[in-house]
Amino acid sequence: MVPTSALPRSPGHPFYAALNKLLAEAKFDAYVEGLCEPLYREGGRPSIPPGVYFRMLFIGYFEGIDSQRGIAWRCSDSLSLRSFLGLKPTESTPDHSSLTIIRQRLPKELIEQVFSFVLTMAFEKKLLKGKSIGVDATTLEANAAMKSIVRREGGGTWKAYLTQLAKEAGIEDPTDDQLRQFDRKRKGKKTSNDDWQSPSDPDARITKMKDGTTGFAYKAEHAVDLDTEIVVAADVKPADQADGETVKDTVVDAQGNLNDATKQECRITEVVADKGYHKTETLVWLGDRGIRTYVAPRRDTRKRRWDDKPEGWQEAHRENQRRTGRDKGKQLQRKRAERVERSFAHVCTTGGARRTWVRGIVEVSKRYLVTVMAHNLGVILRTLIGVGKPREWASMRGFLATCAALWLAILADLVAAGHRVAELASDFADQLLRPRWHFSTSPEAASSTAC
């Protein structure tokens, strides 16, 4: 028998303590428990509180862990994270299989409601304006391998397809090495999404990845408030859908999330995007809804024809081109390139969302949306306490320690030179405004002072 007083305890990480305080002020746990209550039944084994489930996924973002197994192991290994989850010293942390069961139980609509609740928290902190929206997309690596692709019709494998082509080319009973050489040298090689799919994840699409390779992926699209860097909409779509078409759904989702978060009519007035989103039909669609577009135009190799296009298309195209050429349009494009890309860097690169370990577009969307929630919470905390991730807290503490050491070193040198304490502060403040260290002292003191 070991008394609980003898068990190891942790004072908790200051960053996670600040995050818990923010969630407690907004009554986050009570809100998500009210939403999830109809999905749980009375009796049976005690379930994991919804607040603990969301906190564990938040930890995946803040610690840069992409898999649920890694999150479960990290939570069980760290006393400070156990304190963040609100677990007693004698309680065990949830298993990764429990996270899977809860994710499958919660519908996507419920996750979207929690996402809107986090936007409400940002609005109450005056971090949500929703006037100028930047839109961009990136690819997410799916949990599917190219070597296992099969035909959409018939389910034939890639090896069987190559064997048939090799026999037609005159190679009887080809070996695996001969098939690889034949596949490497043959002309007109294509792998179309219309013909091939992954047997383990049919929703994934074949596309070109960020590193130049070809693989199965999804497309994640962000709509970011360019004034505050809050992500107001994030959804996962098939990777083969064009940006000019998916932006419509993203703008509609962003408008609905803003209305739900602010509890009032909050109209988007400007949409900024790169040239991948330049489609005249989309420009007209946005203009009909009172939204000014700042979409970078594509470089046309030949003169465009407008006599076969509907009325208003040419005017929408030219108005967008004029707006992007002005100083305001260039400034908004710089903001988009900086802040929207930064959201992808935080969520996908350092947040662990670039590689997904779940399958199906709905499950991937739910998992990704929770990661974007954590990103928005990090933006709020960066405004309140100056840091948005635990790593930033450690680097800031090191910076403050360096400044304090520099302060003490300067004070020690000046006191040793015989200066009064009152002159110390004024001299040091004066030196901050100069490009070099220079002390106006007597020749005797100057000779004995080295700085």
Label the model's feature ranges.
Residues 80-86:
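Secretory-pathway/luminal and periplasmic proteins that interact with or process carbohydrate-rich
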Residues 40, 60-61, 83, 103-106:
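Short amphipathic alpha-helical interaction patches enriched in hydrophobic/aromatic residues
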Residues 66-76, 87-451:
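Anion-binding and metal-coordination hotspots
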Residues 5, 44-47, 87-89, 344:
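A short, ordered amphipathic alpha-helix with a cationic face
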Residues 9-58, 63:
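Basic, short loop/linker segments at the boundary and entry of helix-turn-helix/winged-helix-like folds
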Residues 1-9:
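Generic start-of-chain signal for non-secretory N-termini
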